[in-house]
Amino acid sequence: MSSYLFEISKTDLAGRIGTLYTNHGKIETPAYVPVIHPVKQTIPSKKIQEIGFDLVITNAYITKNNYGDEAIKKGIHQIIDFDRGIMTDSGGYQVLEYGDVKVLPPEMANFEKGIMTDFAIPLDKPTGFGMPIKKAEEYVKHTLKVSKQTLEDGEDNGQIWIGPIQGGEHFDLVAKSTKGLVDMGFQMLALGSPVEFMESYEYRLLAQMIVTAKKQMPYSIPLHLFGAGHPLTIPFAIALGCDTFDSASYMLYAKQLRYITDDGTRYLADISVFPCNCEICTKYTPEEFRQLAETEKINQLAIHNLYSIKLEVDKVKQAIHEGRLWEYVIKKARAHPKLFEMIEVMTENSEFLGLSTPKFKEKAIFLYSKEDQFRPEVQSYHNMVRKFKSKKKKLVITKESSTKPGYLSHQYSGLKKKFRDFDLIQVCQYNPQLGLIPIEISDIFPAAHHETSRVDFDPKEFPTFEKTWNVFFSNNTFSEIHYDKNDEFLKYFVKMLSKEIKKKSFV
């Protein structure tokens, strides 16, 4: 077993900046892992490394069929001419596509050890999408069995063995598969079969699969996602906790003459201006590009696609560094209606996402819409307010001021002049997403460190506000509340209060 270490340096949501230590150097995560064919390299591996990729994945099963024992003599790094990290798929994709392969798991495991791969995957049986639960259960059982045999089968050559999680849309099986692999001692896990989910636009199911697996994993174990190479799914995969993800999308799209952008793909025939400054897009105009010979056109387009994917990963990394990953994925979600369904999974799992989201950040957060009431930093503040207790009997509630914290605002100064018994009054401001903001804790992040859209929100769409409102009033014994009766948002919640509490307007 390798003594490798996964070191985490920065987190936001379930996403993290980290470092994988391997036999062939360090790899910064999150990392896109381009698929390289071991025999037919259309884009040279050196070019892929030049673009900025330090980890690639190739197929050990195809390597074995084409090179045989010669592969063990040469080693996989010499075969594909790549001196950085290499991950090998043992043939699971072929099992998914064709139903079976002509090699046994122990034989495949020994071959992966022999070719000195850095990351090795046992020969599993992918469940795919739409498989009946009984059959999926058999596949999970088989994969756990061969994974255990592989991990226990003697010494290795320092590889990091990756445990393949199966189960598909059967989340109880995903959980069982994950827990089984963790208990066996795998240092890294990989979630299988998401390609079919993405091809069917089942983004919500994909998100649920990832979250289900992550909840069964120790925080220190990295997670790989098979087949995720679309610029729209990458931010979500990272935000939900995937550290590496492989795909041949850069070449598959190129063969269809599809040009990757930051919000999807465009057919080359439909592009008037290249929205990119990579070496390919600055060399040709779209019309010149379309005139290239077919093979050259595909290869050049594949290189652009690699640059585009690399840029997307780098943007997500920057969002993690800035503490703005939530804002980034919310923006990405609006690129496709089906993709927006992943936001529901994030809001449903805000507590899980909050486990690795810093409670305090250097920069203000942006609150745009109802979805933002579920972002972890906001939820953390709600939890704080739900524990807040005041000895005062009178309560004044106003909209939050533009000056933050609230006790420095002209609005607060005006209240001091308006109420003679001000020292006996509990003052709260409010924000639709953040909820009630007691003036005493209005300087705590993010109450004093946010910007909110100045639009009229529907109070019925803010269950977190309602919960905090109810808990706040049950924890305190106010006999009188002063508020603006023209404030439609606030009026909705005031109606929920008991008749014993006097309601007065201070406007």
Residue ranges and their predicted role:
Residues 339, 343-378:
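Flexible, glycine-rich loop/tail regions that form catalytic "lids" or insertion modules at the edges
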Residues 66, 130-131, 199, 255, ...:
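Short secondary-structure boundary/hinge segments and terminal tails
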Residues 1-156, 365-392, 398-476, 483-507:
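Non-catalytic, usually N-terminal nucleic-acid engagement modules in DNA/RNA processing proteins
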Residues 101, 132-139, 143, 170, ...:
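Residue-level preference for long, well-ordered alpha-helices that form the structural scaffold
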